[in-house]
């Protein structure tokens, strides 16, 4: 990418981040970002496919930091129960702190792109290794189902409409996804 194109892209991300922080992700359109920057929509869409794509790049640095700390959990804790409990606490707090951006990313037109993202893959393999069994298909299924339960949409629904506390949400997931032996380690 040319230097001026990189600078334009960085400027777009910075202004979008500022506007999202000030007015909320849901209140800012791609058109508004282009107007704020004094650029055409074509320039904006040359850098980002859609708002979901832009949100992903805006949050990328935070995702990288999250993944670094997330991986450290396996080194710091030893039982599957502790690893899962601490990782869920960390992940759920991240979801709360970045709710609007994550909603935008997960609601994007290209859902497959999110599931292929480095962030999703890191989460998948983190929990896949935790659930590892002789039945690879079952382990993949179990991991995919956990990640669906951890999607922003499902998490928000449970917290806001079912009135489940975050601690209860975490504990329910621990009960569902870890067997009794692992919970009592």
From Swiss-Prot:
InterPro entries: DNA-bd_HTH_TetR-type_CS, Homeodomain-like_sf, HTH-type_Tx_Regulator, HTH_TetR
Pfam families assigned to the protein according to its UniProt record, in alphabetical order: TetR_N
GO terms assigned for molecular function: DNA binding
Keyword Transcription regulation: yes
Annotated region of DNA binding: 29-48
Keyword annotations from UniProtKB, A to Z: DNA-binding, Transcription, Transcription regulation
Occurrences of domain HTH tetR-type (ranges): 6-66
Record protein name field: HTH-type transcriptional regulator SAR2658
Organism per entry: Staphylococcus aureus (strain MRSA252)
């Amino acid at each position: 990418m040319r230097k001026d194109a990189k600078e334009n892209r960085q400027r777009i991300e910075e202004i979008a981040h500022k506007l999202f922080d000030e007015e909320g992700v849901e209140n800012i359109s791609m058109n508004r970002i282009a107007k704020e920057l004094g650029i055409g929509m074509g320039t904006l869409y040359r850098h980002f496919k859609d708002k979901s794509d832009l949100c992903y790049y805006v949050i990328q640095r935070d995702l990288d930091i999250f993944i670094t700390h997330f991986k450290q959990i396996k080194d710091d804790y030893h039982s599957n129960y502790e690893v899962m409990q601490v990782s869920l606490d960390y992940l759920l707090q991240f979801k709360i702190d970045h709710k609007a951006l994550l909603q935008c990313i997960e609601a994007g037109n290209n859902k497959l792109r999110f599931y292929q993202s480095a962030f999703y893959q890191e989460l998948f393999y983190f929990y896949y290794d935790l659930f590892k069994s002789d039945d690879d298909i079952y382990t993949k299924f179990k991991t995919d189902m956990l990640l669906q339960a951890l999607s922003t949409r499902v998490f928000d629904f449970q917290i806001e409409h079912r009135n489940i506390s975050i601690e209860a949400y975490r504990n329910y997931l621990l009960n569902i996804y870890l067997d009794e032996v692992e919970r009592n380690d």
